[in-house]
């Protein structure tokens, strides 16, 4: 305790006051942070709290030091005498006070002498009387009984005795104790006054609650919580507060709320605080309308025990896991000195809960008070949030929902397929791309495709690694997801209504267009100028290729949503092969996409009305009715369980232990997709063959010569694309346009490549291409095409079927003029890879934004002629099973970084395996030249090249034999070296025999093939062995 301010004769500078006791510093001690306190106040605080009283930094008693200059300054201040109440008016310096008190005339002993009384000490039983200074009758022998003088025998010149001094010291000690007790009484009275104020406030709250009527579940209830600091922290965070002076937009949602509670902290008890508690008072200080800074200071300065009065909202339905389910809104928060962790309050929302704004955690220092405080408001059951902070405008377009998924065991899958975006660097969120229909998430029903996952179990998720780690945690059986979705996202019911209306209008327009086309037989002549321009544009190879690519990218991106729609239908439907409804959708969806991606394109004939006439010219009313039914069927299929938006990205399996099962499912899907695709293609090809044959048989007979040239060129091109075994690099290059088309459209048509000329569908495919080219050539008769070379071969081919077609293919192997070949290679609707993009450019205006225009017509034909072609389908399926190549799923990466899944033939893998096998067979048994040659390592030699190798080997063998014979003749002709020659010959023969033994042993040990053994062990006509024959490679 310091010196009381009342004792000083002059005003004291506030800098000389102690912050703990509020009095003038006595024996000042300074902390390492520069704060000065009284020694008697600071030492107990440092021992017990281990922290500076101003909460700035930790503190230890050994770190304190005295401030001697400050002590000297305080000692020079003038104070009043301790006996001022007795009449002493002197004021002396503080360091002279003790000497003055000892000799003050107003002290107890001095007062006796000044009244003329006896100056002797009080000894024995002598006690001075009230009326005079003489001794009582019990006085000593020198008393006044003998009539002596008042001084008695002590004498006048004597001072006070030792007893007098002892009594004086005793009196001073008692006075000091009395002053200390008075100070404690004052502090106790102040403390009880504060408690009384708190209790009165509680009583007023209770009275107000009781007077407000019966309490309903869901209202606020007051709670009183007593807290004590542990390690200088209370273990919870607060947010909110009344707007400060910088923010004049004050609302009724003021208040201080608990945002987070530290685990195992002082506030984390059964009777402690809970998240979203509204703090009303702290040690009697009202905080209901306080700012955030005032609340922080109140908790800092609060003395233990800290009594906190809170209002707590009781939920209508308490979840089983015992956590609060209140709504928490936060715009900005400031970290207080209560804890040092991030401030984050999660909103526990029930399924019907309205959207809430984004939850943005902040970690700010105490000096950062410029942010707007949090505005909080509680709502009843079905009320919507009407007042949002000004800073939350950017989050008004999103809807937030917290979903809890519980699983019985860790092996049970949640059923969520999540993906992350790579095309936008700013957006690094995790999105739900698919929900398994029979999973936990699907049964819950609150998570939709396209939802963004913000938090998992209260932890922010920024990348896929964090999401996989949290979702695949085996120990966690309860997963709480905070998801966000656009609030303006179209409702599924509204989409269905709009789609139905659009399809009705489209149906009427298409039927009207078909009728008009059927009634105008001269429509072909109207379309001729346009086709001539396109034909001229495709004459130049460079111009044609560039234009095709431009059309492909532009149209693909224009109708990107439609392409995504159809690709997502197929891929989503293929996920559940056991479902009947999904299987039916997959059947029709596959027919759509595959039929639209094969080489049987008829865009020009569709625009000119030729194909439409062939379908509807017989019975328009009946065909229109069937067409309308097909439209309705397609709408139902599209609206039942399919989704318009598909997020094309790489998926992340939540359960990483089932990779093998996924691969097995993909293999089954591949087989099923192939069967469905082949079946639909065969039906459509047979139908088009029959339909177009009936309508345009006379045209084929007139223009057969030109058609044969077109067909031959395309067949040769297809042969190059299919016979890809000898040129694996060229296959990727030639087929790149198909995948480029898929890239621009963000989807991949699921087509299956077939080997050429080995099955009935291949023959039908070629025939149908000729038919379509015949219609194209018929409309281009004005472009200089000659019709004098026409024959009746085409009609005979159509009548005789597949056998005649195979014969005609042999005749069509003749050479082509360069000009016709170039034209045929670059016609857009004859290209199997640019057909899907070129199709959009020639669709009528009323159907340009609806990609399934042509696919509906294909479906109509497929359904109409399905039953009549069952036998043909069975034959095609049997022939396709033995001829179709194996396909596999590939994950491809586009130029912008996005990924997509497509099916590629496994020919590359087969070629690699063949090369490795050849390399293994040739290892250790080839010649030195072949071993060192990099060009021949792993290369596959074709049949023609192997024939050339044999010819070269024979030529080399003849050359060596000739050289050997000439050498022997030279040796025989020289008699002078006869003996030496024989010796040399013997040495050569012996060395040859030795080498052949080693070589044969080596060859047999290294598993040399029979052909190579025969080649290396061959003998020349004169009996000598040939050792360096050219290596012959066996066929794998």
From Swiss-Prot:
Residues 129-161, 515-590, 726-819 are annotated as: Disordered. Changing residue 784 to R: In a colorectal cancer sample; somatic mutation. InterPro entries: E3_ubiquitin-PDZ_ligase (IPR051971), PDZ (IPR001478), PDZ_sf (IPR036034), Znf_RING (IPR001841), Znf_RING/FYVE/PHD (IPR013083), Znf_RING_CS (IPR017907). Residues 655-689 form a coiled coil. Residues 129-160 have a biased composition (Gly residues). Residues 548-566, 726-735, 805-819 have a biased composition (Basic and acidic residues). One of its GO terms (molecular function) is zinc ion binding. A zinc finger (RING-type) spans 18-56. It comes from the Eukaryota. Keywords: Coiled coil, Metal-binding, Repeat, Zinc, Zinc-finger. Residues 774-799 have a biased composition (Low complexity). Gene3D superfamilies: 2.30.42.10, Zinc/RING finger domain, C3HC4 (zinc finger). Residues 224-314, 402-486 form the PDZ domain. Residues 736-750 have a biased composition (Polar residues). PANTHER family: PDZ DOMAIN CONTAINING RING FINGER PROTEIN 3, 4, PDZ DOMAIN-CONTAINING RING FINGER PROTEIN 4. This is PDZ domain-containing RING finger protein 4.
């Amino acid at each position: 305790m310091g010196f009381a301010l009342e004792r000083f004769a002059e005003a004291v500078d506030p800098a000389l006051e102690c912050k703990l006791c509020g009095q003038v510093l006595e024996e000042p001690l300074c902390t390492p942070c520069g704060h000065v306190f009284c020694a008697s106040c600071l030492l107990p605080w440092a021992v017990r709290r281990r922290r500076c009283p101003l909460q700035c930094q930790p503190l230890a008693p050994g770190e304190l030091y005295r401030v001697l200059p400050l002590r000297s300054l305080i000692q020079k201040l003038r104070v009043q005498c301790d006996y001022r109440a007795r009449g002493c008016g002197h004021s002396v310096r503080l360091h002279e006070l003790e000497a003055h008190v000892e000799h003050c005339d107003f002290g107890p002993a001095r007062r006796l002498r000044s009244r003329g009384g006896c100056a002797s000490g009080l000894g024995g039983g002598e006690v001075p009387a009230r009326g005079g200074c003489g001794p009582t009758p019990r006085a000593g022998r020198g008393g006044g009984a003998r009539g002596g003088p008042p001084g008695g025998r002590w004498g006048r010149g004597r001072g006070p005795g030792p007893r007098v001094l002892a009594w004086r010291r005793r009196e001073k000690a008692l006075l000091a104790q009395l002053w200390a007790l008075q100070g404690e009484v004052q502090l106790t009275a102040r403390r009880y006054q504060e408690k009384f104020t708190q209790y009165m406030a509680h009583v007023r709250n209770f009275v107000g609650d009781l007077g407000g009527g019966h309490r309903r579940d869901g209202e606020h209830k007051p709670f009183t919580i007593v807290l004590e600091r542990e390690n200088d922290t209370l273990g919870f965070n607060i947010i909110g507060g009344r707007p400060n002076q910088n923010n004049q937009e004050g609302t009724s949602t003021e208040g201080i709320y608990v945002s987070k509670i530290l685990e195992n902290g002082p506030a984390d008890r059964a009777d402690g605080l809970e998240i979203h508690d509204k703090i009303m008072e702290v040690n009697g200080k009202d905080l209901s309308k306080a700012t955030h800074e005032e609340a922080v200071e109140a908790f800092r300065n609060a003395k233990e025990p800290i009594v906190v009065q809170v209002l707590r909202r009781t939920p209508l339905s308490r979840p089983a896991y015992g956590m609060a389910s209140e709504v928490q809104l936060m715009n900005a928060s400031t970290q207080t000195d209560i804890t040092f962790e991030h401030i984050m309050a999660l909103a526990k929302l029930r399924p019907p809960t309205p959207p809430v704004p984004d939850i943005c955690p902040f970690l700010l220092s105490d000096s950062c008070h410029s942010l707007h405080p949090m505005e909080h408001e509680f709502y009843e059951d079905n009320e919507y949030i009407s007042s949002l902070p000004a800073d939350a405008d950017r989050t008004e377009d999103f809807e937030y929902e917290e979903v809890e998924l519980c699983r019985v065991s860790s092996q049970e899958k949640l059923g969520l397929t999540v993906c992350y975006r790579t095309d936008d660097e700013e957006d690094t969120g995790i999105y739900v791309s698919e929900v398994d229909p029979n999973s936990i998430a699907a049964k819950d029903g609150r998570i939709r495709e396209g939802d963004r996952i913000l938090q998992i179990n209260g932890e922010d998720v920024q990348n896929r690694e964090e999401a996989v780690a949290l979702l695949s945690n085996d120990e966690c059986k309860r997963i709480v997801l905070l998801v966000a979705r656009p609030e303006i996202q179209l409702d599924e019911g509204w989409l269905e209504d709009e789609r139905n209306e659009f399809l009705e209008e489209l149906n009427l327009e298409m039927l009207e267009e078909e009728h008009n086309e059927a009634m105008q037989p001269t429509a072909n002549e109207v379309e001729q100028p346009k086709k001539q321009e396109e034909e001229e544009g495709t004459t130049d190879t460079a111009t044609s290729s560039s234009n095709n690519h431009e059309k492909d990218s532009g149209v693909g991106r224009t109708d990107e949503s439609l392409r995504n729609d159809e690709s997502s239908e197929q891929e989503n439907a293929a996920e559940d092969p056991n479902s009947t409804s999904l299987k039916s959708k997959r059947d029709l969806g596959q027919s759509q996409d595959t039929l639209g991606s094969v080489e049987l394109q008829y865009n020009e004939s569709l625009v000119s009305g030729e194909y439409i006439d062939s379908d509807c010219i017989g019975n328009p009313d009946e065909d229109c009715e069937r067409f309308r039914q097909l439209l309705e069927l397609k709408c139902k299929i599209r609206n039942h369980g399919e989704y318009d938006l598909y997020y094309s990205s790489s998926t992340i399996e939540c359960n990483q232990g089932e990779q093998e099962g996924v691969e097995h499912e993909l293999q089954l899907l591949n087989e099923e997709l192939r069967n469905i695709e082949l079946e639909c293609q065969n039906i459509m090809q047979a139908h088009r063959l029959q339909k177009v044959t009936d309508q345009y048989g006379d045209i084929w007979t007139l223009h057969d010569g030109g058609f044969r040239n077109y067909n031959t060129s395309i067949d040769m091109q297809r042969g190059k694309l299919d016979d890809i075994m000898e040129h694996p690099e060229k296959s990727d290059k030639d087929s790149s346009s198909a995948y480029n088309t898929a890239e621009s459209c963000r989807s991949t048509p699921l087509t299956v490549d077939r080997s050429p000329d080995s099955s009935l569908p291949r023959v039908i495919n070629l025939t149908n291409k000729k038919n379509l080219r015949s219609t194209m050539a018929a409309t281009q008769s004005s472009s200089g095409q000659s019709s004098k070379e026409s024959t009746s071969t085409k009609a005979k081919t159509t009548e005789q079927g597949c056998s005649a077609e195979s014969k005609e293919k042999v005749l069509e192997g003749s050479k082509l003029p360069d000009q016709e070949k170039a034209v045929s290679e670059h016609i857009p609707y004859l290209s199997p890879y640019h057909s899907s993009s070129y199709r959009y450019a020639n669709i009528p205006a009323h159907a340009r934004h609806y990609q399934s225009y042509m696919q509906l017509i294909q479906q109509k034909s497929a359904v109409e002629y399905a039953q009549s072609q069952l036998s043909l389908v069975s034959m095609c399926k049997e022939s396709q099973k033995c001829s179709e190549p194996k396909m596999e799923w590939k994950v491809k990466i586009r130029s912008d970084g996005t990924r997509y899944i497509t099916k590629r033939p496994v020919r590359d893998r087969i070629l690699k395996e063949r090369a490795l096998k050849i390399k293994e067979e040739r290892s250790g048994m080839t010649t030195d030249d072949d071993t060192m040659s990099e060009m021949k390592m792993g290369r596959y030699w074709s049949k023609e090249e192997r024939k050339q190798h044999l010819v070269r080997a024979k030529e080399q063998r003849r050359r060596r034999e000739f050289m050997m014979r000439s050498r022997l003749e030279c040796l025989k002709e020289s008699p002078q070296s006869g003996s030496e020659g024989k010796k040399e010959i013997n040495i050569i023969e012996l060395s040859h025999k030795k080498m052949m033994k080693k070589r044969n042993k080596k060859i047999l040990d290294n598993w040399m093939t029979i052909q190579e053994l025969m080649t290396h062990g061959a003998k020349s006509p004169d009996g000598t062995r040939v050792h360096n024959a050219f290596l012959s490679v066996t066929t794998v």
